[in-house]
């Protein structure tokens, strides 16, 4: 099964790398499951409290009518779904929603707009939202599609903490999912965001019809960026009627999903790894294995954009049974170790999942 020796786990601090090979990443993914879980859990404990989970809440601030053709997304104007397009919400309404999220235990508030890219006139209300969320003492995250350098700078100047922009899958499989933009377009926006000094939230979706090698390659692409994404959301596809991928989606083996979480944790030791969309389709036992494998972040609340979420009562029950607690941010055993190389699903924007 595994022909490459796994490195020793003896080191007390995680090794941050940006030069993973296909062979190394595949060897980790396909390692005997017990060895994989032990390695991931050990690396997780080197930087994080394994009993603390970071909690986010997501709000769709502009729904539907998106010009992109992402094959899984209910918000695309290219697909025949029942989702009506809406205008951008008023900043005051968004901030009221953020207050409720904070009262419910969220430390980060994520705002998604279904755009290919924001128009310059849209930036002022979005910046007002960001500043309002920050004034509540919460971290702010937005996903707005592709950005210009100036738009990224405006968001950074407003104090934005995170920008979500998912790769979704591997570069090879990507054209089977999206045709209105390229993988390079996605990477280009990530670079603009990082250059502006904003932390990156970037992950993908499992269940699009991809092969295991596509999952490995997506994570390898992220792990080989000059700076790892501070947050890596892993989504389980919830097929949406009327989208092309709902006709071709393939169920994901729960063990394969857990392997993907473990690989993300091992290759990006200081990043938050998030169980994003699709938790309603996961058993408590599957989610528990994900937490053991290094997932340390979730979305709370009843909905994520256009898909359901377990809701606070169900999450509270699972946390109680596992002895988990919401993390009082900010971060890794004080997140101080992020600074040395790293500074750390939701495309809630043009996508119909949480992708954050």
From Swiss-Prot:
- Where in the numbering of this chain does the Radical SAM core domain appear? 51-270
Superkingdom classification of source = Bacteria
The segment annotated Disordered runs over 310-356
Q: Which UniProt keywords apply?
A: 2Fe-2S, 4Fe-4S, Biotin biosynthesis, Iron, Iron-sulfur, Metal-binding, S-adenosyl-L-methionine, Transferase
Looking up Pfam families in the UniProt record yields: BATS (PF06968), Radical_SAM (PF04055)
Keyword Transit peptide on entry: no
What EC designation does it have? 2.8.1.6
* GO biological processes: biotin biosynthetic process
What is this enzyme's catalytic activity, as reactions?
(4R,5S)-dethiobiotin + (sulfur carrier)-SH + 2 reduced [2Fe-2S]-[ferredoxin] + 2 S-adenosyl-L-methionine = (sulfur carrier)-H + biotin + 2 5'-deoxyadenosine + 2 L-methionine + 2 oxidized [2Fe-2S]-[ferredoxin]
Q: Bias regions of kind Basic and acidic residues — which residues?
A: 312-350
Instruction: Report the cofactor remark.
Output: Binds 1 [4Fe-4S] cluster. The cluster is coordinated with 3 cysteines and an exchangeable S-adenosyl-L-methionine. Binds 1 [2Fe-2S] cluster. The cluster is coordinated with 3 cysteines and 1 arginine.
Q: Does the keyword field hold 4Fe-4S?
A: yes
Kindly tell me the pathway this chain contributes to: Cofactor biosynthesis; biotin biosynthesis; biotin from 7,8-diaminononanoate: step 2/2
**What cofactor is needed?**
[4Fe-4S] cluster; [2Fe-2S] cluster
Q: Which residues bind [2Fe-2S] cluster?
A: 110, 141, 201, 274
- Gene Ontology molecular function terms on file: 2 iron, 2 sulfur cluster binding; 4 iron, 4 sulfur cluster binding; biotin synthase activity; iron ion binding
Question: What are the binding positions for [4Fe-4S] cluster in this chain?
Answer: 66, 70, 73
Give the family per the record: Belongs to the radical SAM superfamily. Biotin synthase family.
Biological function: Catalyzes the conversion of dethiobiotin (DTB) to biotin by the insertion of a sulfur atom into dethiobiotin via a radical-based mechanism.
How does this polypeptide assemble, per the annotation?
Homodimer.
Q: What is this protein called?
A: Biotin synthase
